[in-house]
């Protein structure tokens, strides 16, 4: 993310990218992990609470290496939220809800950012303020990243929350589950290679763009959009 902005050499774009990266690392990622912790707590598991993860403090959720990678290239990770599914009131559905909470927080936050952008754009269209246009660009940038991470995490493949959601619908003793657990290290390497080469990013970006357009349309409705 920052690397792409630096390559443009445009000061305003670089400033917006720096602000968006900081917002992503210190707001979006902590909210994602907090959502997992909150959902687990609501399902009866006090593991996140006892681990100090039921908080929005970035220090509890940001992984140093993952945070740096997110800022630089737009892909990384936070500290995994510890949960014990055995404590859930309903183990199967509890796992689904807890896994879905993280990506859902990213999508809802992205929608909120797009709504704020729509408000600022409506005001700037009247006043013609360059500062307001820059603020709108920042929120659009932040929304794009947040929604991209939400869609990415919903992929039903190992390493992402989408896989844990899918697991909740697979029968116990499923061959698919067993195969994934036996080959998870190899799968992680393959997925990381696909992400860093951009092969996996293209379809995720296309789906994210569809979600962004839908949320942008909803956000513009109050202003006659």
List each model region and its residues.
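Hydrophobic transmembrane alpha-helices and their immediate loop junctions
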Residues: 1-225
């Amino acid at each position: 993310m920052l690397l792409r902005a630096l390559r443009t050499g445009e000061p305003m774009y670089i400033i917006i990218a720096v602000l968006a990266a900081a917002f992503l690392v210190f707001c979006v990622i902590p909210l994602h992990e907090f959502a997992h912790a909150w959902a687990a707590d609501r399902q009866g598991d006090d593991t996140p609470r006892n681990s100090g993860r039921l908080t929005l403090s970035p220090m509890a959720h940001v992984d140093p290496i993952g945070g740096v990678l997110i800022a630089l290239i737009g892909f990384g990770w936070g500290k995994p939220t510890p949960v014990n599914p055995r404590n859930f009131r309903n183990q199967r559905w509890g796992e689904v809800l807890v896994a879905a909470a993280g990506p859902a927080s990213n999508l809802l936050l992205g929608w909120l950012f797009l709504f704020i952008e729509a408000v600022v754009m409506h005001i700037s269209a009247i006043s013609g303020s360059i500062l307001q246009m820059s603020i709108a660009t920042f929120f659009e940038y932040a929304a794009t990243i947040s929604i991209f991470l939400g869609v990415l995490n919903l992929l039903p493949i190992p390493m992402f929350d989408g896989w844990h959601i899918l697991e909740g619908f697979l029968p116990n003793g499923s061959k698919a589950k067993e195969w994934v657990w036996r080959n998870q290290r190899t799968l992680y390497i393959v997925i990381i290679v696909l992400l860093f080469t951009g092969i996996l990013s293209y379809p995720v970006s296309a789906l994210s763009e569809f979600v962004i357009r839908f949320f942008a349309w909803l956000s513009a409705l109050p202003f006659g959009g």
